[in-house]
Each structure stands twice: as C-alpha cells, then as structure tokens.
C-alpha cells in the first residue's frame, strides 16, 4: 500500500468515525499509542532490521481507541524507527480532529515507555489531553518513590503488630 492509498484509507476511516459518533457519541476516548513490527521478507523498500524485535520488517506507528479497539490512525515506517520517532507530528492531526469535530469527548492518551518523551507530554498538555505513559524502572524513579516504599513498610509492620496483638 503506497502513501496515497493509506491516506485515502485514513480519510474513509475518519468519515466512518463521524457517522458512528453521530449515532452514539462516546464520553471519552483513550488514544492508545503503539508501535509494532510487521515482518517483511525479500527486498521491499523500507524493510529493515529492528534491533528491539531482532527481526526484519516495518515498524509502523499506530493509534487505536483503547476502549473499542477501533483503529484511529496508522503510519507505515521503516524498520529502523524508534517507537516515538515522529509521534508528535503523527498525533497532532488526531488531536485537531477530536478538538474541532468532537470537543465534548474527553481525551486520554496511553502509551508504553517507548513514548516517554517530553515533546509528547507538552503536546498533550497544550491540547488539554490527559496522558498516562508507563516508565521503565530506573534509579531516579526509585529515589523519587522511596518514601512510598518506606511508608508501605511502616504500614505493613503496623498491621502485622495489630494482628499479632489481636491473639
């Protein structure tokens, strides 16, 4: 599928979305961002080795409705692209569509650690979109959350003493 065909497909998808929403408007949409490997064999243009997946193929960027599973947008990318490469440009037309055509729908963006980029956070905040991004554990996060671990330890110890004293 070439870029023109994909754009036509996405336009049809947008028209269908408007028709569906005219019948039943959702209260909220979870914009579920993801990237995945599409295995490819031979010498297709854009086919490349992806180190994360340890395989050859394409690495498309995808946005689904996290509630219904409906495809909102897909962008074919070569296999070498990192998960978040181009995500701000990919997402803005989606945000524009929802903010202009469906301003009453609450938007929440969800992504894994591959989308933990300040540009995406800023974009969501500037467009009034909530976001939840899973972060990989690291020393900085452990340090920032250490007080919670200490509090949990204290609560657990207190509860154990309460149980022991109850007998």
Description of each model-found segment:
Residues 41-46, 72-76, 86, 118-124, ...:
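Short acidic, glycine/serine/threonine-rich loops at helix termini
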Residues 1-62:
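Active-site-proximal, Lys/Arg-enriched surface segment
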Residues 51-102:
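Electropositive, glycine- and tryptophan-enriched low-complexity nucleic-acid-binding patches
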Residues 35, 65, 73-78, 113, ...:
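Short, structured patches in soluble enzyme cores that scaffold and shape functional sites
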Residues 1, 27-37, 69, 107-116, ...:
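Short, conserved catalytic/metal-binding motifs centered on acidic residues
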Residues 24-27, 57, 66-67, 103, ...:
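Short, well-ordered loop/turn elements at secondary-structure boundaries
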Residues 133-167:
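An anionic, glycine-rich sequence signature occurring as long contiguous blocks
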């Amino acid at each position: 599928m070439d870029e023109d065909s994909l754009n036509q497909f996405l336009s049809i998808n947008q028209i269908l979305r408007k028709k569906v929403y005219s019948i039943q408007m959702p209260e909220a949409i979870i914009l579920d961002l993801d990237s995945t490997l599409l295995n490819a064999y031979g010498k297709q243009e854009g086919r490349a080795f992806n180190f994360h997946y340890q395989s050859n193929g394409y690495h498309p960027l995808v946005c689904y409705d996290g509630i219904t599973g409906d495809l909102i947008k897909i962008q074919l990318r070569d296999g070498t692209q990192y998960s978040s490469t181009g995500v701000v440009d990919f997402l803005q037309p989606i945000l524009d569509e929802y903010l202009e055509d469906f301003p009453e729908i609450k938007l929440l963006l969800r992504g894994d650690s591959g989308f933990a980029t300040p540009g995406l956070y800023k974009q969501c905040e500037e467009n009034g979109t909530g976001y939840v991004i899973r972060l990989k554990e690291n020393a900085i996060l452990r340090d920032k959350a250490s007080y919670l671990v200490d509090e949990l330890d204290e609560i657990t110890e207190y509860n154990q003493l309460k149980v022991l004293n109850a007998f």
